Structure formats: structure tokens, C-alpha cells
């Protein structure tokens, strides 16, 4: 499968340091930062540093180190923010959009972590 990566997308520019962000955590392969238009009291974006467009692209082509680092970083963020149920938090939602039907706005794979209120049903 072929994925067209646009290296001028906003997350690529953030990763290159061209656009500032409110970093929550950074690891070797992953950057997590606050969303500039939050949809919940807690809204953090977890972004792999590699050039991946969607989850399936990331899962198919990322190295084992990138895959593990990304998921452990996401879990670490939930714990750091006090929303992980295992750490006494009341929960969170993760969302990753892929392609036009999901309304993916930035063509760089990323995971939304949303928390801080009851999120309700995902779909009606």
C-alpha cells in the first residue's frame, strides 16, 4: 500500500521546531502536546516522530521500537495527567482518525487523548 506523506503538514512542522507547542512529554520516537483547540478539559495529541499518515501506515511500517515507544508514551501521558483508571483517574478516551470518512484533518498519524469529563457515547 502507498501513503503520500506531506512534510508541510502542521505536525511535521511542529516536530521540526518550526511551530511552537505546549509539550507534555517527549521521547525518542514520540512527541505529546496539548491540542490548541481542546474538545475536553484534557486534550493531548500523541504524535510519532516518523513520517506516518494513518494508524494502518504506522502499524505496517514503523519499527518495533517506534510502536512500543508510541503506545507506552500514550499510557504514560494518561498516568501523568491523572486520568488513567489504574492510577485513580476516572478515565479517558483515545481517538485516531484515518482518511476522509473519519474527518482526519492532519495527514500525520496521531492519537487524541481526551479526558476530564464524561465523554458520553462515541456514536449515537
Roles of regions detected by a PLM:
Residues 1-124:
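HIT superfamily nucleotide-processing domains
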Amino acid at each position: 500500500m502507498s501513503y503520500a506523506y506531506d512534510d508541510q503538514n502542521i505536525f511535521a512542522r511542529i516536530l521540526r521546531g518550526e511551530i511552537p507547542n505546549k509539550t507534555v512529554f517527549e521521547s525518542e520516537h514520540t512527541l505529546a502536546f496539548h491540542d490548541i483547540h481542546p474538545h475536553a478539559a484534557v486534550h493531548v495529541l500523541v504524535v510519532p516522530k516518523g513520517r506516518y499518515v494513518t494508524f494502518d501506515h504506522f502499524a505496517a511500517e514503523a519499527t518495533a521500537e517506534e510502536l512500543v515507544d508510541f503506545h507506552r508514551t500514550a499510557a504514560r501521558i494518561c498516568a501523568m495527567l491523572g486520568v488513567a483508571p489504574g492510577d485513580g483517574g476516572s478515565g479517558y478516551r483515545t481517538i485516531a482518525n484515518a482518511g476522509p470518512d473519519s474527518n482526519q484533518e492532519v495527514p500525520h498519524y496521531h492519537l487524541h487523548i481526551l479526558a476530564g469529563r464524561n465523554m458520553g457515547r462515541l456514536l449515537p
